[in-house]
Amino acid sequence: MKEKIRLSGVPETMLQTIYARAKESRGRGEIHDAKAEEIIEKLDYDFSLADKDTAMRSGVIARTIVLDRMTKEWLASHPGAVVVNIACGLDTRCYRMSGYAHWYNLDLPETMAVREKLLPESGTISQIAMSAMEDWGSKISEQNVPVLIVIEGLTMYLNAKDVQQIFAVISNRFPKATVFVETMNPMIVKRFKEKSIEGSHAKFTWGVKNGVALAALLPDFRFVEEHSLCEGMAVFAPV
């Protein structure tokens, strides 16, 4: 029996992204996400808009390629680290990575209720059902270990104040954490439209020019480097 999921707004976008990863896994295979394929088979959901939205799908695959590579490289040089995946949705990166001591997936309670049904997790993978703007750090038991925070597919649905609050929560609990955060250029926020995202009644609301501009908003953080989704596109759809 298939699961019927009722979500709207930003939480619903997680269904579009996992569909994109599942479809790519069955196609050219620049990524292979067995968990995504498994989850899609369990869902009773109309993916027709996501199926037609090639722009959304290409973006999801490109960022998956880039963030998978970055996370894998970081974990290789920080064995035994803790990873916190903020706004995880139905992300399955924790199943594609190794070398971490504990992986925490964090999202809003309604989202985590769906994740718990489809991806019940235990052992070195834990669920945190909280807003990224709350003190979720109190749920992390490990101390004095390297910490990586991944924020994917979230900031473009917020505003500058919300983003600053999320980073304040991080710096309060984990002052030495490394953060990988996906952002969107303001011009793209203003002009770009994704059919499947609009179909879920979510809307892009915020962007920042580059990593230096983001760091200027975050006094406790230092900008290190930035990567473009074009790096993922070069693998996914080489010219």
List PLM regions with ranges.
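A short, conserved alpha-helix within the catalytic core of class I
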Residues: 127, 135-138, 157-175
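Hydrophobic/aromatic residues located in beta-strands of well-ordered beta-sheets
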Residues: 83, 103, 179-181, 223
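A C-terminal cap/extension of S-adenosyl-L-methionine-dependent methyltransferases
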Residues: 234-239
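Short SAM/SAH-binding signature in class I
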Residues: 144-156
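Short alpha-helix
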Residues: 201-231
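Rossmann-like AdoMet
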Residues: 1-84, 88-130, 142-144
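Short, glycine-/aromatic-enriched active-site segment of Class I SAM-dependent methyltransferases
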Residues: 186-202
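Conserved beta-strand signature within the Rossmann-like core of class I S-adenosyl-L-methionine
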Residues: 148, 170-186
